[in-house]
């Protein structure tokens, strides 16, 4: 074999390995394209909430450093996904609050199981994040949502605690003395309950689709819908 032939063979092998790597990354979800992820998600029963509820406020905290890990574990432009039936219920809650001069801001919706594991490792001692050994969070099936109350200008209203903070005061049963906070909690709870959600007792911001409380949906891994996992350093 001549030197030119060997050089050509090496180039061919390198190109083949590169293409195989790209294909593997796409299949495992490490190459992120929000539109493509939304299409794959739809095939598994998930929809982008922004398309179902135009104008709803979304601030996915795990796509920023403002979370218990201190790092973004979702990619930028992460779609805000829920099961289609759950998203329709959320649309009802938004309409109920809109009629009162308020609305919702979503902090988390569908959560890849890969991210759930990272959250448990970072904040497991707080009791906020279910261990995978004990079962998966309903977020991982797209049937749970974390959210808060905003006014018509999109300003967050006073609530018992910040997101993912101070579980000793984060109960759905507010015991503080601030009447405004109490009213805000009750307003949010009433709208979500009327729309078909059940609230997690320990977190005022967490609501589960009541239809699936005793009928959990299959978890959907991020790689299955081309959403890459970004582990904290």
Describe every region a protein language model picked out:
Residues 22-107, 121-202, 208-233:
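Extracytoplasmic cell-surface/polysaccharide-interacting catalytic and binding patches
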Residues 10-20:
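Bacterial N-terminal signal peptides
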Residues 2-11:
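Bacterial N-terminal signal peptides that target proteins for export
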Residues 112:
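Segments that shape or occlude catalytic/ligand-binding pockets
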Residues 1-2, 105:
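Compositionally biased, intrinsically disordered low-complexity regions used as flexible
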Residues 115-116:
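Short, well-ordered surface patches within globular domains
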């Amino acid at each position: 074999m001549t030197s030119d032939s060997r050089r050509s063979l090496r180039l061919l092998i390198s190109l083949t390995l590169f293409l195989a790597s790209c294909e593997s990354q796409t299949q495992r979800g490490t190459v992120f394209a929000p539109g493509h992820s939304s299409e794959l998600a739809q095939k598994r029963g998930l929809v982008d909430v922004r398309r179902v509820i135009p104008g709803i406020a979304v601030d996915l905290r795990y796509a920023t450093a403002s979370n218990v890990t201190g790092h973004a574990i979702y990619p930028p432009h992460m779609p805000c996904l829920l099961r289609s039936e759950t998203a329709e219920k959320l649309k009802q809650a938004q309409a109920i609050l809109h009629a009162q001069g308020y609305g919702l801001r979503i902090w988390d919706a569908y959560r890849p199981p890969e991210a759930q594991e990272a959250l448990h490792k970072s904040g497991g001692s707080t009791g906020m994040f279910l261990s995978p050994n004990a079962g998966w969070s309903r977020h991982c099936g797209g049937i749970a949502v974390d959210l808060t109350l905003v006014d018509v200008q999109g300003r967050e209203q006073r609530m018992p605690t910040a997101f993912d903070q101070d579980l000793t005061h984060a109960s759905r049963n507010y015991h503080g003395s601030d009447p405004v906070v109490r009213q805000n909690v009750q307003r949010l709870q009433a709208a979500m309950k009327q729309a078909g959600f059940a609230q997690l007792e320990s977190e005022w911001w967490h609501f589960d689709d009541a239809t699936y409380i005793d009928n959990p949906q299959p978890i959907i891994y991020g790689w299955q819908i081309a959403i890459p996992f970004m582990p904290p350093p």
